């Protein structure tokens, strides 16, 4: 039952991002709710789905799918500092990919944005890959796999 709840939460969280951001639904919702209303609805739904996802993961049974080699834990520990640097760099001012940003007023990309346009997505991609490599259970595959699918730049 707990694995089913985790799977449904992962589908709603990941699918909700794709559905609400789709070019055919988003404009309709923005027209009906306004930009701020849409962002409020989107944020509230994703926050609820994410909380459910984490709650379900914490309660999921451990079902081993494979036994990760010890080196995978070292790989995860090696990738996490890079993921953290990318995440912190993405929170810098003048982020062309942040909600409400006006890219035309940002000028030449600087800092981490001179390296990649989406440092936060790369941070989550590395984070998910590192955790998938270091964990071999069904709940981890569902959680980290769904976040990887969402984060792939």
Regions found by a protein language model. Name each.
Residues 1-117, 122-153:
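Membrane-anchoring alpha-helices and their flanking helix-loop junctions
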